[in-house]
Every structure is written in C-alpha cells, then in structure tokens.
Amino acid sequence: MVAENNKNKDVTLSASMDNNNNNIKGTNIHLEVHQKEPALVKPESETRKGLYFLSNLDQNIAVIVRTIYCFKSEERGNEEAVQVIKKALSQVLVHYYPLAGRLTISPEGKLTVDCTEEGVVFVEAEANCKMDEIGDITKPDPETLGKLVYDVVDAKNILEIPPVTAQVTKFKCGGFVLGLCMNHCMFDGIGAMEFVNSWGQVARGLPLTTPPFSDRTILNARNPPKIENLHQEFEEIEDKSNINSLYTKEPTLYRSFCFDPEKIKKLKLQATENSESLLGNSCTSFEALSAFVWRARTKSLKMLSDQKTKLLFAVDGRAKFEPQLPKGYFGNGIVLTNSICEAGELIEKPLSFAVGLVREAIKMVTDGYMRSAIDYFEVTRARPSLSSTLLITTWSRLGFHTTDFGWGEPILSGPVALPEKEVTLFLSHGEQRRSINVLLGLPATAMDVFQEQFLQI
C-alpha cells in the first residue's frame, strides 16, 4: 500500500562535480536531480503493532548511514524501476515491519520503535545526465552523491528521521540509482545486506533466502548487570595534540586508497617482520590493513609522542555469542573492541607491534566480553568515545554487490559519506573483489602525509 504525503513539493537539487571518469576526464558536470513528492510505502498486509525492543548494541550506534547502488542493464531500461522497487518494498516490509514504524523513546529512556505501519519514505527522482557522468563513487562525496539519497531536511533529531528512506533516481542512459538512508540502530552491515537482498528477491518473485529473525530481547541485559571487563572503548581520551583544531582549520579531503592483492601481500610481509610472535606466521588482511592505517593516520595527524590513541573496530558477534545468534538475526550483532597505546610507541615500533595490538583486540571478543558490554550500557548509558580515535568499519565481506532487483547486480555501490571524521571504511573492490578500497577523510596536509606512506608500501 502506498500513501501520498502532500506536505512536500517537488524539489530540484544541483551540484557541480569534477568528473574523474576515464571516458570523460576533465569535464565538469553540473548534476541536477529532480525529486518528486515523497510517498509513504506501507507494508502490503497488516503487521504487528506496539513498541519494538532495541538491544543495547542497537542503542550504541544510532547513526545515519547513506548508501547508493547503481544499476544498468543492456536488456532492460529504467522505465519500470520505480514501480517494481516500490511494490517489492511494500511486500518485504511485511517481514521487516519495524522499518515502517518510527523511532521514539521508551519509558526507560531508551530508543525503541513504535510500529505504527506509517511507512518508509519513498522518492522518485530524475537526473539530468548519464549515470557514468556521476564520476568516481569509490570515494565519499556527500555534496554530489547526497543528491541521490532523500534526507528529511527539517529533522531536528534522529527521532524525526524515519528508520529508512529510499530514493530511485533514473538517468538518461537507462540506468538508475537506489539511494538508501538507514539508521544503524535498525541493523548492522550484515542485517542491512540481508534486508536489501531480500527486497531484491521479492522484486524478482523469489522467496526470501534468509527470513529475518526479529526478536532482539535475546540480547537483553542480565539482571542484575555484570560488568566484567574494562571496556576502554568508552574511555574519553584527552586531545593533547589539538587534532580537532586541525580539522577545523583545514578542509577535510576524502580519498580512496586501493590495496590490490600485490599490495596486500607486501603489507602482510611487512607486518610479520621484526616480531618473534609473528615471525613465520601469517596475519590476516584485516590485521595488516588496520595496523597500517592506524599507524599512518596517527603519523599523518602529527600526534604528540605521549598522546594516547585508540583503535576501535567492530567484530561480528553472531557466531561468538553462546548460544549463537539465530540465522537472519535482524539487529546489530556486532560489538566494538579496542586497543589503546601512545602515539610515539605506535609509530616508532614496527608494523608488527600494531598487528599484535589488533590481534589481541580481536581475541578479547568472547561471549563474556559482549555480555559485559551490553550490561555496561545498561548501567552507564555511555556510548563509545571517538576522541583521538580511529574507528574502522569493514564492508569488504558484505554481499551488497549481489543485490538484484531484476536488472542484474549493481555495477557500483558504496557510501555517500563517512558518518564521522574518525571513521575509516574498508570496501571490497576489483576483479573477484580481491582488492580492498580504504576510504577515509583527513585534513588536507595530513592527507598528503598519508598518501606518501601508502606509496611507500
């Protein structure tokens, strides 16, 4: 069922972009996107009402994530794209009914979802150019790519932003882009991937490969809560190096660095040198990349030697919980782990030292650690601090590239922007997706230093 929202008028958004596409290098395209009036797409049939519980792992990460998926088929134009995707959304919302609700605050003062069946905000749009004229979407570009995602511009806080908004933008070449704006409290990367892939399966008339498991109370805090770990992920670190002022004084540049299989091999070799514990042992691509980016970013920001620096990254806890989370668990099944050391030690010691810190942070994540993190939030209501921190999030193992609404898999997909300046994203890339793109934002002078270190690998 689709209900029209008459509060909004048609809108035209525009942005100039320097196009780095190899076919039209050097051209300057002025992208205009005409958005039609938003509609509300409701579940096709009646769904459960009332308040829907969000776990403490969901509470910790209520940030907006914007992504785009570019589709183009030689056999099928974009004439039916809006109709097919909108209808399939209405059908898949029967399974993912909380997405049609609205965020609110529970009597306990926590985020929860009021399952009102109000619907997902859906926008049809048209662009004034061909899809390959968008340029390089392998790096975040909120000014340009943001035109392909619908934002609730007058929202004062996340409670006024629907859990999901969708925009389908048709291009003159017959291709189209699906832009999604989703609140991370509704699902992590795996949950989001399963939702979008299920949406595509419904569009093609197929049954869901992985029906969602919706009961998040299985991750309820213990009664009484038991905090059994230090949980330095919540620690506020003093900014002795005035890093925040550097971001204020200089423009932030967003760049994508491609680590192909050969570069990853070299990095992993460097990562096991000068270490008795790692000598002769291989390390994973994630361990080597995370260690390199942490050291290189710390050096690029010219942190003082005695400045503490924190590495945060998410570990999928689905198989680590006891018992394991059910297949299709719809909420956040990730937990943040961490490592803290002084910048001087991190930079002066070999890469293998940082790899060891990453490895120890991974080993920390057990059922007990994750339950303790859930209980920590229950007692303190604290959220992880990003002060003097690098937060790495990994999409390289997620199957967003397999999404198919009937036009084949996306030719490109990726984030519109990084949610915070401290966030770095790992994305799979290239032939057989064996390369990894590292996306990050740094002040201009720091980005130059980071690039020099990348070229030295």
Swiss-Prot record:
Pfam families: Transferase
Active site: H184 (proton acceptor), D404 (proton acceptor)
GO molecular function terms noted in the UniProt entry: hydroxycinnamoyltransferase activity; omega-hydroxypalmitate O-sinapoyl transferase activity
EC numbers, comma separated: 2.3.1.188
Biological process (GO), any one: suberin biosynthetic process
Superkingdom of source: Eukaryota
Record keyword Cell wall biogenesis/degradation present: yes
Catalytic activity, as annotated: 16-hydroxyhexadecanoate + (E)-feruloyl-CoA = 16-feruloyloxyhexadecanoate + CoA
pH dependence: Optimum pH is 7.5.
Thermal behavior of activity: Optimum temperature is 10 degrees Celsius.
InterPro entries documented for this protein: CAT-like_dom_sf, Plant_Fungal_Acyltransferase
Tissue specificity statement from the Swiss-Prot or TrEMBL entry: Expressed in roots, seedlings, leaves, stems, flowers and siliques. Detected at the protein level in roots and in seed coats.
Traits of the deletion mutant: Elimination of suberin-associated ester-linked ferulate. Altered permeability and sensitivity of seeds and roots to salt stress.
Keywords of this entry: Acyltransferase, Cell wall biogenesis/degradation, Transferase
Function statement: Involved in the synthesis of aromatics of the suberin polymer. Specifically affects the accumulation of the ferulate constituent of suberin in roots and seeds, but has no effect on the content of p-coumarate or sinapate.
Name of the protein: Omega-hydroxypalmitate O-feruloyl transferase
Lineage, highest ranks first: Eukaryota, Viridiplantae, Streptophyta, Embryophyta, Tracheophyta
